[in-house]
Amino acid sequence: VYKRQDKDSPRYVSFEFLESSGKCFNEKISPVIVFVNESKEGIKKAISYFKKPILQFHGDESQDFCSSFNLPYIKAISMNEKDFQNKIIEFADAFAILLDSGGQKIRGGTGKTFDWKLIPKEIKNNLIIAGGLNSNNITSLIKSYKPYGVDLASGVESKPGKKDITELKHFLKIVDEI
């Protein structure tokens, strides 16, 4: 996963990094590139380095904008938004919907969970859950909601933007045993 977010984000990556990383992938691997309100030109440049990227949008992008690249995309929707259910319907063509606890100022990586009881049961898209996931709560989430995937950030980091390998291995071991 490459996070092409705002430059102040600890998870930000440059175009130069994307270009050098793109040389490591073939068409069998689909990297996910995360964008927050990036320009169409910036997205086109970022995806040009990869054969089969998946786009992940965490900003205020419209459905028309997200689908205009003719690539699979994931749309992040904050469960703190009043109209989150309408947003889920709006992005029905998305490869996946990512439900997160972020808001307008902090788009993700908050380390906070949202109330999982708010997850709509009738989502037709693949469902990815984010927000405060760690080795203490992942079993409950997966057993109760069976998401297509989970998105990790601060729950397995030793500091913002730096994954803790020991915690990540522990997390993956738990998931593997479910």
PLM regions and their residue ranges:
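Short, small-residue-biased leader/transition segments that mark boundaries at the very start
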Residues: V1-Y2
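Short loop-to-alpha-helix "cap/lid" segments that border enzyme active sites
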Residues: E16-C24, Y49, D60-S154, S158-I178
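N-terminal active-site wall of soluble small-molecule enzyme domains
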Residues: D6-L71
